[in-house]
Amino acid sequence: MAKNNTNRHYSLRKLKKGTASVAVALSVIGAGLVVNTNEVSARVFPRGTVENPDKARELLNKYDVENSMLQANNDKLTTENKNLTDQNKELKAEENRLTTENKGLTKKLSEAEEEAANKEQESKETIGTLKKILDETVKDKIAREQKSKQDIGALKQELAKKDEGNKVSEASRKGLRRDLDASREAKKQVEKDLANLTAELDKVKEEKQISDASRKGLRRDLDASREAKKQVEKDLANLTAELDKVKEEKQISDASRQGLRRDLDASREAKKQVEKALEEANSKLAALEKLNKELEESKKLTEKEKAELQAKLEAEAKALKEQLAKQAEELAKLRAGKASDSQTPDAKPGNKVVPGKGQAPQAGTKPNQNKAPMKETKRQLPSTGETANPFFTAAALTVMATAGVAAVVKRKEEN
């Protein structure tokens, strides 16, 4: 009966396996448990206590509560131990990071100390040079003072010998005073010259640094200009060859179509476009010449203004290169169109157009059937099939713009 009652109130799942077995065995045979944080001890109850199931249950419940509290305490300590372990890992990682950062800072400090030592050495050398100049100046001044003293001594001796002549003596005293004043003025002048030499030395050093930087920049600009000139000359040669070929093809095309009115209109329109392109090219050439003058005047400008002017010139050169590429592409398209047009017969048999005469409509056809094709041919060149904007406008503009760039680059290189 007592065994059945005690089994209903056991709550030993949270105890260790050995502790639970001992507790169950002791409770069955009539023993009590005393549970501490680190150990489980057993003591034998008197016979009367074992025979009292209520008291045994009360003790077991009490031990169960204490065991639960200890288990909760143990879980809490385990969690805190885990947190402390994680914090320890983080602190170690932070320590490693700080150690690495300390090494980097130590290296930077060493480099800074080395740079400071180099600067200090340069300063010492400069001070040594100035000190040498100062010593030479002081020696010169001392020599002059010695000479002045010797002159004064000689004058004094001469004055002692000529005491009888008061006028001569007075004149000698005045001359001595003048020499003394001149000596003092010479001393002041020497000190002033020394200060001026020191200032000029500093100024010369600064100008030398600026001159070195400017010379390097001008050398880079000259090299870039030479490369740009070579590229422009190469592009100009290619475009000139293309232009000659296109001109030859145009002459052939014009010779075969001199009697057509629409070619004359297209030629007039092309002339207007060429004149307009010539004006644009002249304006661009004037702008390039202005930029060249600004480049020549940039020798007196600051480094910042030189950089801005160089960027402007590079942007202009880039725009011209893009224009050259675009126009070369247009020339290629025109050549392809001309080649396809040369393979097409000029007119169908029976529909040959006589220059200066209109074509009568065929029998059985309406007169307005050919209006749309005629309107279309007026908007196109017969040789290439392109629109009324003549194909040689782009070529002329390319040649003139390229020639202007080449002239500017040549002037820049000569300057």
From Swiss-Prot:
C repeats lie at residues 160-194, 202-236, 244-278. Residues 211-279 are annotated as: Two directly repeated 27 amino acid blocks separated by 15 amino acids. D repeats lie at residues 311-316, 317-322, 325-330, 332-337. Residues 280-343 are annotated as: Hydrophilic. Residues 75-125, 157-189, 202-231, 247-277, 332-387 are annotated as: Disordered. Keywords: Cell wall, Coiled coil, Peptidoglycan-anchor, Phagocytosis, Repeat, Secreted, Signal, Virulence. Residues 211-279 are annotated as: Binding to CD46. InterPro entries: LPXTG_anchor, M_anchor, SMCR, SMDRR, YSIRK_signal_dom. Sequence repeats lie at residues 69-75, 76-82, 83-89, 90-96, 97-103. A motif (LPXTG sorting signal) lies at residues 381-385. One of its GO terms (biological process) is phagocytosis. It is found in: Secreted, Cell wall. Residues 54-133, 170-340 form a coiled coil. Residues 69-103 are annotated as: 5 X 7 AA approximate tandem repeats of [KMNR]-L-[TQ]-[TDA]-[ENQ]-N-[NDK]. The keyword Secreted applies. Belongs to the M protein family. NCBIfam families: LPXTG_anchor, M_group_A_cterm, YSIRK_signal. This is M protein, serotype 6. The lineage of its organism: Bacteria, Bacillati, Bacillota, Bacilli, Lactobacillales. The gene is emm6.
